[in-house]
A protein has these predicted regions:
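Short, charge-rich binding segments
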Residues: 10-13, 30-32, 41-42
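Structural recognition of the beta-strand scaffold that forms the well-ordered cores
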Residues: 20, 49, 68-70, 101
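Second-shell loop/turn segments in exported
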Residues: 25-33, 37, 52-57, 85-89, ...
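Post-HExxH zinc-binding segment in Zn-dependent metallohydrolases
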Residues: 54-98
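Pan-zinc metallopeptidase signature
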Residues: 90-97, 103-181
Length: 181
């Protein structure tokens, strides 16, 4: 099986779900993080069992982002996750998960639940969806989120140790053609 895990419906009916987890992936997890990572992946996949999907029309990045938002709020995010604003808001997984966390913080408890519930019975139409929930286009929300992210610190100019400076001065002096006879 490629990837980490996936959730699928059952042939019985849509109320029965199956979670498939890659044994190769489990075996590759650092033993110090294995329990937490397995729990995190299972939480993510369990969300897929209960979340709505806009009658099959919601972007995959939003679906995965909701699942990673729940994982994040459960305290099970892996150490390599980063808040970043590169690309589109619906790039998915932690990228969208952190965006949804910002929405929850900015618009109040239950905001992500409102997003999920709005996907229950009607098709996802981006132009309408976010404005109905938050009164703004998703691009405007994404831009606000981007503005709220900490700005990267500018790189400080590396200061050369005094010994390196002295060595460079000596070499320059030795190589100076005017001193050669």
């Amino acid at each position: 099986m490629g990837g980490v895990a996936y959730t699928t419906g059952s042939d019985i009916d849509d109320d029965h779900k199956e979670i498939h987890f890659s044994l190769d992936y489990i075996g590759s997890i650092d033993s110090a993080r294995q329990e937490e990572e397995i729990q995190g992946v299972l939480v993510h996949e369990m969300v897929h069992c209960w979340q709505w999907n806009g009658v099959g029309t919601a972007p995959g990045g939003l679906i995965e982002g909701i699942a990673d938002y729940v994982r994040l709020k459960a305290g099970l995010s892996p150490p390599h996750w980063k808040k970043e604003n590169t690309g589109k808001w619906d790039a998915g997984y932690q990228h969208t998960g952190y965006f949804l966390e910002w929405i929850e913080d900015k618009w109040g408890d239950g905001s992500v639940r409102k997003v999920n519930n709005a996907l229950k019975d009607k098709e996802y139409i981006e132009e309408e969806f976010w404005e109905e929930l938050f009164g703004k286009k998703v691009e405007d929300l994404w831009n606000e989120y981007s503005e709220d992210l900490p700005k990267p610190k500018p790189k400080e100019k590396e200061v050369e140790p005094e010994s390196v400076k002295l060595e460079q001065e000596i070499l320059a002096y030795v190589e100076d053609d005017t001193l050669k006879g």
